[in-house]
Amino acid sequence: MKYPTEYNGCFAACPDPIDFRAFTTVNIYEDKNAYYYDGDFKKLARPGHRDYLGQISATVEQMNKKELALGTKTRSGQQFDIWEAVYSPVGKDGYPQPIWDKKTGVIDHKVAAYWKENYDLAYILKRDWAKNGENWKGRIHIYCGDMDNFYLNNAVYLAEEMLEGLANPPYDGVVDYGDRAEHCWNGDHTQPNYITRLRYHRMFIPKWAELV
């Protein structure tokens, strides 16, 4: 996306959040707190990990506080800290600026605005489509289980809706979902996920070869 003339498309399976309005279960632009849903009468913990039946094994708060116990200042080596290390601007202390307070979950919307302009792929696609659409047309292929363990399908839904609305040119790509498939579903509707996720290259290389 940042080098549209140098790469011949993407084949993304279970992509990390590609629309930050659904950063797993958090909208980093509109939500105030990453750990709880707002409500008039109660606060409800945001789920962070589930199985294909929707059984929740961890909340966003629990996952983040585990990271905090492993290392402060984005140094745990775990998933939320990894995203923060990539997306965030450098703070005055030399470490990535937190997208939210690890202890309370309060979101820093100034950091969110930086993420949006630099790493929110769905937003950048829409923003730059008039300039780069001809390079991106027909080259975007996204596959995701509709029961992704980390709710990554939520961002794919939003990105798909945006892509379908593009014109001049139309995006002419592929977005496909695996029914009840968990993390790392890659587009194969014929085999169980635990098999197909091990042969991803055998699936996407023939499709890629058609483009080149």
Model feature map: region roles:
Residues 1-212:
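Non-catalytic cap/lid and distal C-terminal segments of serine-dependent acyl enzymes
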